[in-house]
Amino acid sequence: MLNEFKAFIARGNVMDLAVGVIIGGAFGGIVKSLVDDLIMPIVGAIFGGFDFSNYFLPLSSAVNAPTLAAARAQGAVFAYGSFLTVLINFLILAWIIFLMVKGVNYLRLQVERQEKAAPEELPPPPADVQLLTEIRDLLATRPTA
């Protein structure tokens, strides 16, 4: 059973998937930083300096804190600001992946077009066919008697 598991893990597809998941996790961190550190401050500046992360609705009368962390400590809250931030993260990530796939598809299409446009070179005929062609050509140039 252990040897089967080792063989399964050592297969190329599983290793490629593992690398993809690790890189995807790191890419998610980059997108989160892009949204939190670069995009959200600009959005906040445009819309009057608000921060989505602290937008919430208290679900009980005991919650009266000004920040989301303090409000969660006091009771249940509907944290729609956090959801908006995650939604923006997702949309940016989806847009980036869409652009990457679109670029790869465009490059693939260009390569296919170049392959179709390039004339196919016929392989040289076999030696015996070349010899027979030369003999035919020589016989055709001989004067007939």
From Swiss-Prot:
It comes from the Bacteria. It is found in: Cell inner membrane. GO terms for molecular function: mechanosensitive monoatomic ion channel activity. Keywords: Cell inner membrane, Cell membrane, Ion channel, Ion transport, Membrane, Transmembrane, Transmembrane helix, Transport. PROSITE patterns: MSCL. The keyword Cell inner membrane applies. SUPFAM superfamilies: Gated mechanosensitive channel. InterPro entries: Mechanosensitive_channel_CS, MS_channel, MSC/AndL, MscL_channel. The chain crosses the membrane at residues 14-34, 38-58, 81-101. It is a multi-pass membrane protein. One of its GO terms (cellular component) is plasma membrane. NCBIfam families: mscL, PRK00567.1-4, PRK13952.1. Homopentamer. Belongs to the MscL family. Channel that opens in response to stretch forces in the membrane lipid bilayer. May participate in the regulation of osmotic pressure changes within the cell. PANTHER family: LARGE-CONDUCTANCE MECHANOSENSITIVE CHANNEL, MECHANOSENSITIVE CHANNEL MSCL. This is Large-conductance mechanosensitive channel.
